[in-house]
Amino acid sequence: MSKALLKFVRLSPTKARLIARQIQGMNAELAIASLEFTPNKAARVLSKVVASAVANGSLDAKSALIVSCRVDAGPVLRRSIPRAKGRATAIRKPTSHVFVEVVEGKEMKSSKSHKKNQAEGK
């Protein structure tokens, strides 16, 4: 199992989680290919993190499976914008921490059946 972590990326966690849910459980090569054609900033960021996780474990992208893809909220950068009558309102610029775990294809099947057995109570 290999992991990759990207912290403090200027990206909304809610928007990134939409893309992260789509690639969870996918083949790494297929996930990277599908993320290339997704017109979203989160897709570009997640594609790089998945590629990094595959490279960290020196795995082949064709046989690697994404076990978990998690996006956690980072600190929020607070900025202000001038408004009428001398006031200022706050602008929130959220950041995210992206975490990806990748395993070889054969290991994934055993862990999936293990999770299924746990869910059934066996």
From Swiss-Prot:
Superkingdom as given in the UniProt entry: Bacteria
Keywords: Ribonucleoprotein, Ribosomal protein, RNA-binding, rRNA-binding
Pfam family, one: Ribosomal_L22
Keyword rRNA-binding belongs to the record: yes
SUPFAM superfamilies hit by this protein: Ribosomal protein L22
One GO location term (cellular component): cytosolic large ribosomal subunit
A biological process from GO: translation
Annotated spans, Disordered: 103-122
CDD domains in UniProt: Ribosomal_L22
GO molecular function, one term: rRNA binding
Family of this protein: Belongs to the universal ribosomal protein uL22 family.
HAMAP family noted in UniProt: Ribosomal_uL22_B
Quaternary assembly: Part of the 50S ribosomal subunit.
Function recorded in the entry: This protein binds specifically to 23S rRNA; its binding is stimulated by other ribosomal proteins, e.g. L4, L17, and L20. It is important during the early stages of 50S assembly. It makes multiple contacts with different domains of the 23S rRNA in the assembled 50S subunit and ribosome. The globular domain of the protein is located near the polypeptide exit tunnel on the outside of the subunit, while an extended beta-hairpin is found that lines the wall of the exit tunnel in the center of the 70S ribosome.
Protein name from the UniProt record: Large ribosomal subunit protein uL22
Species the sequence originates in: Helicobacter pylori (strain P12)
The gene coding this protein: rplV
